[in-house]
């Protein structure tokens, strides 16, 4: 007769959490920063096609670290949720808070019921008419949700990157300064006391939620992805 081994619920949840954290820690960091011009999303990502940052709806964007197939399925589900809700009710009823709640439920259900948790960490950002109306939500692998202010940092080096950004963040930052600040934080720590080498433009992914998209471009869609030339010009 095969002997049954008992694993306490506490140990099971701890093992699941440790497993997810290890997977996330292997991922390169992502930074989401609220600034005067809107919200800047910056990721260390050498792939030109496998995006860590994406558009969800008019003024809502998504950023993630971890396993690509897992967070991409969540991004697509978020787009479907937003489209259906906006069509069934009103476009103004699609909010970052509502989307974050849906993601929290999905992540929590997978964490407790499936064989393995998702190895992902998400950020949902919504740009407002003013900086005070910006919304930043951070979601972890177990469905925990946090309402963040000013900026969100995710990934294996999150603490180091967050510390660097916290020292330089201010409400008056424009898009160029916000992206520079994010890149300075993402730059690998130097092995000596020399200045850290910046991340090259071809190895980063940058997008913005433009606070003034309706005024400048006449479009409700605030999301805009920057190519290498745009990034170089922005940082010039």
Swiss-Prot record:
Where is this chain's protein located in or outside the cell?
Answer: Cytoplasm
Query: Listed GO molecular functions?
Result: threonine-type endopeptidase activity
Chief place where the protein resides: cytoplasm
The biological processes this protein is annotated with in GO are: modification-dependent protein catabolic process; proteasomal protein catabolic process
> Pathway involvement?
Protein degradation; proteasomal Pup-dependent pathway
- Activity regulation description: The formation of the proteasomal ATPase ARC-20S proteasome complex, likely via the docking of the C-termini of ARC into the intersubunit pockets in the alpha-rings, may trigger opening of the gate for substrate entry. Interconversion between the open-gate and close-gate conformations leads to a dynamic regulation of the 20S proteasome proteolysis activity.
Subunit structure of this chain's protein: The 20S proteasome core is composed of 14 alpha and 14 beta subunits that assemble into four stacked heptameric rings, resulting in a barrel-shaped structure. The two inner rings, each composed of seven catalytic beta subunits, are sandwiched by two outer rings, each composed of seven alpha subunits. The catalytic chamber with the active sites is on the inside of the barrel. Has a gated structure, the ends of the cylinder being occluded by the N-termini of the alpha-subunits. Is capped by the proteasome-associated ATPase, ARC.
Sorted alphabetically, the Gene Ontology cellular component annotations on this record are: cytoplasm; proteasome core complex, alpha-subunit complex
Quote the HAMAP family the UniProt record gives: Proteasome_A_B
**Role, per record:** Component of the proteasome core, a large protease complex with broad specificity involved in protein degradation.
What family does the entry list?
Belongs to the peptidase T1A family.
Pfam family name, one: Proteasome
SUPFAM superfamilies referenced in this protein's UniProt entry, alphabetically: N-terminal nucleophile aminohydrolases (Ntn hydrolases) (SSF56235)
The UniProt keywords, alphabetically, are: Cytoplasm, Proteasome
Please give the name of this protein: Proteasome subunit alpha
The lineage's top-level taxon is Bacteria
Which species is the source of this protein? Answer: Pseudarthrobacter chlorophenolicus (strain ATCC 700700 / DSM 12829 / CIP 107037 / JCM 12360 / KCTC 9906 / NCIMB 13794 / A6)
């Amino acid at each position: 007769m095969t002997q049954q081994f008992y694993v306490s619920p506490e140990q099971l949840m701890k093992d699941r959490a440790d497993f997810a954290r290890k997977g996330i820690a292997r991922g390169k960091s992502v930074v989401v920063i609220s600034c005067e011009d809107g919200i800047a999303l910056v990721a260390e990502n050498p792939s030109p096609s496998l995006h860590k940052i994406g558009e969800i709806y008019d003024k809502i964007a998504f950023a993630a670290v971890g396993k690509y197939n897992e967070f991409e399925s969540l991004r697509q589900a978020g787009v479907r949720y937003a489209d259906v809700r906006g069509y069934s009710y009103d476009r103004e009823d699609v909010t970052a808070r509502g989307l974050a709640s849906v993601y929290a439920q999905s992540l929590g259900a997978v964490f407790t019921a499936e064989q393995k948790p998702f190895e992902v960490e998400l950020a949902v950002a919504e740009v407002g008419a003013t900086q005070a109306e910006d919304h930043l939500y951070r979601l972890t692998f177990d469905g925990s949700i946090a309402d963040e202010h000013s900026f969100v940092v995710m990934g294996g080096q999150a603490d180091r990157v967050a510390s660097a950004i916290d020292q330089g963040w201010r409400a008056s930052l424009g898009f160029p300064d916000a992206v520079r600040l994010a890149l300075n934080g993402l730059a690998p720590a130097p092995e000596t006391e020399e200045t850290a080498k910046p991340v090259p433009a071809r190895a980063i992914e940058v997008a913005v939620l433009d606070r003034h998209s309706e005024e400048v471009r006449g479009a409700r869609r605030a999301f805009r992805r920057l190519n290498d030339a745009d990034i170089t010009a922005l940082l010039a």
